[in-house]
């Protein structure tokens, strides 16, 4: 009978209640029953085989035993003599007796074998085929009915609400019929499995009992053993009979219960308030929506349970047609806490739908579809569902929103503090999302004032302190605010600001709108953008550029009130607004917008607009194009070449470095901010405004004493010049039109007109990101020798001549001051000190001029290359005088070890600078240009702007251009418009650059192709020595 070591664990009964619900647990239990039945079938099959083999062997044995019995019975003892003794008679009869015993035994064997062959083997075969085989047939029918019902159910649920009512009724009736057949077959199958399992206990054992009894009867020698086992056998028979009686009684009750469940399919739940199958709508991400496949959704079948007391909702993806059984601990079911339940509006594309939200996933709405109207009502009732709130079409429904309160500010500060302490160098920060459960937990704890102090420092919350989790929690808080940080009120205004024609207009409009935000919104936005600014500085390591941050935070900070196709298409403008805020953080958040700022007309004054990479400067026309235009009259009258910008002497524009006496950081003009020479058309009004060429300059306070240039204070703090060619777009400003916001000073007769082109406070933080420099333009005049000159005429009437200041060398920037410029200081934004001129004085304001660019196309590295030196920084001087006599002036340099002394070759200049002035006034020029007093050009020069270089670097560049070994870096994208012109992208290196025969054009090689390149589209790289 075997020991008790391999006792199999009992199977759980198959309840009809579970059969109706058809839960995954029921399916698993059913599968265990099926496996156990297969195992039993296999064992019975082996037993039948062994019994057959035994019967065959027993028949052979019986034949041999009968032969032996015959031999024993026929054995004849012959007696010697005429009489035998009793012993001999007993001996002679013993063999016959033996034969008779063996015969009797073999007769019983024959009976036993006949009965075993007829009743044992046939009964076992019949039991296995009819009972276990019948279960397998039922399983096939059950699987077929299951598949047919599920497919019918899904077809019914997928029917559109636009179908006719009779079609829906027919489909409903068909589904009901299939459902009834499926349930009938399911109940029958469950009943049959349990019946077979129970039949094994008595029918199978009863057959084997008969087999054993036959063998015991067969063996006469086993009579005592039979007597010993009589009680056992009798007891076994009694138990078998009792089991049979129990089976008959249970079968009657089960039949009654089956009838009961066919009439009423459910009973009051004990563990779960409601459970069953639901279909979940899974929509594609809004960022993945395309115009070809908008709002594509899929419906996935889940087995769901709900406990009303704990409001615990579990969902497990499961489909009976393609299920895969796993261990209960390996199932990936999701447990959530129900927050709200709302019936879906009847206008929805599917029937029987309702929306659920959960505390673990705020702001996420789950849309489920029930299996029928009745099932739909049961779910709504169990979850205390509410009727839908009918909003306007396209309204965004926010299930749970955060508020911009003190707890929110504290949470954001803590998140930013932790992230910045870690260095902001995690790759993909704010792009890679953290674990959803951790994010929700961190938000819940961080916004709880009792827990917020501990969550960022307590070791038990260490698993929540991953950088991606913190960054995702910060984003989720901002995204789920009851109103976006930049408010619904100004959303369309921000979008319109991002659609402005020029970058400066966009920046100024965004600047104004930011200061219209409520104070809490402004403070939070200031904190977030300041943090994102720091993130963007670590772009090389975290790969989060300003553009990437705009993509991530655009929909978060600028959320539309209504969800529509138009709002989706405007997402790119959300990103542009965020890019502007990050790129111009210091300008926008540290300086209030001025009410009297007037933006220049981009169509009338393109020369002073900020040239972005998307709006590169106008290229210098080639000679062939100029000739063609001139022949058709497109360039104006040939008799008045002075009014034609193409025939004007193009001024050389240089990058000049300026330094204050002690505290001012280094400033330089940005190469990207230099206007195009061909845009500086010299109009007739500008030509008539003065007798000579005007150069409006911002100079230190000086007095003209007997023709000598004399300073009134010892430090030159700001020096800014604007070329004569800009007078067509920048009018002369008299003293009656002083505009302090722009730092403009007008002077009467006898004074030099001062105008600040970019009156900007320099912030150490912003300058580290985007170095903003003063732009200085100069009109080189005819050299009387080899020295270069810069001159300007006075604005006084009758002044037709100019004084010339001869400068031959440049004092390069000091390394320490250059480092101070790029590293900045902790003192925050700094302002220019006031400049006095005679009786007129003014103070620089804090705001940024709208003409000031917000970024440069040249990298910090290129600026450093152009400024690499160990000497002091300088400022350029432009001086005027009513006298035509010589002006003697001496220029002092702080360091003369590496540079040649300043020389005056044709004019004797003597120093008259104060003893406290530590500035070296310098300028660097390329080939000079001769201008007459009337301002007409006598010869044409090279057009494009050029970065300032030290004299020896400039000479080296000249030599490299002459020999064809110069190297340049492209600043803008350019598409070759005619044969012989190169096409290139920004930040490409062009080699073998040399002068060309076309004015304003160079010749170079890129990717093995040689052609012309516009000189104002490139900057020279530092020569290799």
Swiss-Prot record:
Biased composition range(s): Low complexity: 854-866
Protein source organism: Drosophila melanogaster (Fruit fly)
Residues of the SH3 domain: 963-1023
One Pfam family per UniProt: BAR_3
GO MF entries: GTPase activator activity; phospholipid binding; ubiquitin-modified protein reader activity
Record GO cellular component, one term: cytoplasmic vesicle
Chain positions covered by the region annotation Disordered: 824-866
Entry annotated with the keyword Cytoplasm: yes
Tissue: In the adult brain, expressed in the antennal lobe, the subesophageal ganglion and the alpha/beta neurons of the mushroom body.
Marked site (Arginine finger) residue numbers: 431
Biological process terms in GO annotation: cleavage furrow formation; negative regulation of epidermal growth factor receptor signaling pathway; positive regulation of receptor internalization; regulation of actomyosin contractile ring contraction; Rho protein signal transduction; syncytial embryo cellularization
Job of this protein: GTPase-activating protein for Rho family proteins. Essential component of the CLIC (clathrin-independent carrier)/GEEC (GPI-anchored protein-enriched early endocytic compartment) endocytic pathway. During hematopoiesis, inhibits Egfr-ras-MAPK signaling by promoting Spi-induced Egfr internalization through CLIC/GEEC endocytosis, thereby preventing plasmatocyte overproliferation. Essential for normal mushroom body (MB) development and consequently the formation of olfactory long-term memories.
Protein name: Rho GTPase-activating protein Graf
Disrupted gene: phenotype observed: RNAi-mediated knockdown in embryos is lethal at 24 hr, likely due to defective cellularization. During cellularization, the F-actin network at the base of the furrow canal is unorganized, the furrow tips contain wavy edges and there is a loss of contact between adjacent furrow tips. Actomyosin ring constriction is enhanced, and the nuclei have a bottleneck appearance likely due to premature constriction at the furrow canal tip during the mid cellularization stage. Another study reports that flies are viable and fertile.
Subcellular location: Cytoplasm, Cytosol; Cytoplasm; Cytoplasmic vesicle
This protein's domain notes: The Rho-GAP domain is necessary for inhibiting contractile ring constriction during cellularization.
Annotated Rho-GAP domain residues: 402-589
